[in-house]
Design a protein with these regions (language model features):
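Cell-wall glycan-active module
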Residues: 1-182, 192, 269-270, 276-277, ...
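A structural motif
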Residues: 202-207, 253-265, 286-302
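Solvent-exposed, acidic/flexible segments
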Residues: 150-161, 170-173, 193-201, 220-228, ...
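Glycine-rich, acidic and aromatic/proline-enriched surface loops and short helix-turn segments
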Residues: 170, 182-187, 200-213, 254-258
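Short, functionally critical alpha-helical segments immediately adjacent to catalytic or ligand/cofactor-binding
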Residues: 172-190, 231, 248-253
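Catalytic and binding regions of secreted/periplasmic enzymes and modules that target cell-wall glycans
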Residues: 235-264
C-alpha cells in the first residue's frame, strides 16, 4: 500500500496554520512527528504506517489531533479540505478503513467550524480588540440543530439501538445516551482513532479494561453489547462525579481530568461557564450530542 504525495500537499496547505508555514523546518517537523507517534499512537497504527510514507502521514495525523485538542473552534475549519481529501485514501485500503470510519464521524466538526467562521463579524470596537474568543454555546447549539435535522438513521442503527438502550437502562443510565455512538463512530464498530480509541463508543484501552472489556484475543470494544455496557458504566461514573449530563458528556470526550481542572480554575459547577474553555472538539461534541438526542428522541440532554 502506498499513499500518493497528496499528504505533502495537505501538510503544506491543509493542516498548518499560515503563520506557521513561513519558517517551517521540515526536519524538525518530522522529528517531532515521530516522537509524537511513539507517545500517542497505538501499535496497530504504527504497523499500518510502516508501508507508507510514514513521516508525512504521521505529521498529518499529528496536526489533525492537535487542532482537535486546540483552544479555538474556528481553527478546525482549515482542516475540512484536508479531511475530505484524505478520507477516500483511508477508505481505499482495508488496513486503514477503521481510521476512515473514525474520521468520517468527525467531518461535521470541520463543517460546523466553517459555518461559525462565516458568521458576520461584530462591529469593530474603538478600543483595542479583546482577547480572541470562541463562539457562544448557544450559537453552536443552533448550528447543530440545523445540521442534524435532515439526517436519517445511520446504517445498522435500527438493528442495534433497541438492545443498546436495554443495556443502558440496566446500567441505570438514560437510554437516550446510546446516540453517543452516532457522534463517536457513526455506528461503525470498526472505527479506530489514531490514538487507539476503538468501536461504537470509541473507548480507549485503559477505559475498556477498567470496565471489564477484553482486548485480546478479540477486541470487545468492536462488539456492540459489551462496548455499550462499558460505555454506560463509564457515563454513570462521570455523572456521579459531576452531577450534570453536559459535564459528563464533555468528560467522556475530553477526559474527566480536563473538566475537573476547568471547574476548579473557574470556581464553578456550571457547564456553561467552562464551555468556551474546553478543547475545540469537545466544544463541538457536546452540542452535537445534544442535537442528535433531540432529533432522535425528542429529549433534552440536560433534562435526562
Amino acid at each position: 500500500m502506498k499513499f500518493p504525495v497528496v499528504f505533502a500537499i495537505l501538510l503544506a496547505g491543509g493542516c498548518l496554520a499560515p503563520a506557521q508555514t513561513n519558517d517551517l523546518d521540515l526536519g524538525d517537523v518530522f522529528d517531532a512527528a515521530q516522537k509524537w507517534a511513539q507517545d500517542n499512537m497505538d501499535d496497530d497504527v504504527l504497523k499500518t504506517l510502516q508501508t507508507v510514507d510514514r513521516d508525512q502521514v504521521v505529521d498529518f495525523l499529528n496536526h489533525f489531533q492537535n487542532y482537535l485538542k486546540g483552544d479555538f473552534v474556528v481553527d478546525l475549519a482549515q482542516l475540512h479540505t484536508a479531511a475530505q481529501t484524505v478520507l477516500p485514501l483511508l477508505d481505499a485500503h482495508p488496513e486503514t478503513q477503521p481510521y476512515a470510519a473514525w474520521l468520517r464521524a468527525r467531518l461535521d466538526y470541520f463543517e460546523a467550524a466553517e459555518t461559525l467562521q462565516q458568521l458576520p463579524p461584530k462591529p469593530a470596537p474603538e478600543k483595542p480588540l479583546p482577547p480572541r474568543q470562541n463562539p457562544s454555546f448557544k450559537i453552536e447549539q443552533e448550528i447543530w440543530i440545523k445540521k442534524v435535522a435532515p439526517r436519517p438513521w445511520p446504517k445498522n442503527a435500527q438493528e442495534i439501538v433497541p438492545e443498546l438502550k436495554r443495556i443502558f437502562t440496566s446500567e441505570q443510565v438514560p437510554a437516550q445516551l446510546v446516540w453517543l455512538a452516532e457522534v463517536e463512530s457513526g455506528f461503525d464498530a470498526r472505527a479506530r482513532s489514531p490514538a487507539g480509541a476503538v468501536g461504537l463508543f470509541q473507548l480507549m484501552p485503559t477505559t475498556a479494561k477498567k470496565f471489564g472489556l477484553n482486548l485480546w484475543p478479540r477486541d470487545q470494544r468492536q462488539q456492540a453489547e459489551p462496548a455499550a455496557r462499558a460505555a454506560a458504566k463509564y457515563l454513570r461514573q462521570l455523572h456521579a462525579q459531576f452531577g450534570d449530563w453536559r459535564l459528563a458528556v464533555a468528560a467522556y470526550n475530553s477526559g474527566a481530568g480536563t473538566v475537573q481542572k476547568l471547574l476548579q480554575r473557574y470556581r464553578t459547577k456550571s457547564f456553561a461557564r467552562i464551555a468556551p474553555h474546553l478543547p475545540a472538539e469537545t466544544q463541538l461534541y457536546v452540542p452535537k450530542v445534544e442535537a442528535t438526542i433531540r432529533h432522535r428522541e425528542g429529549a433534552e440532554l440536560e433534562q435526562l
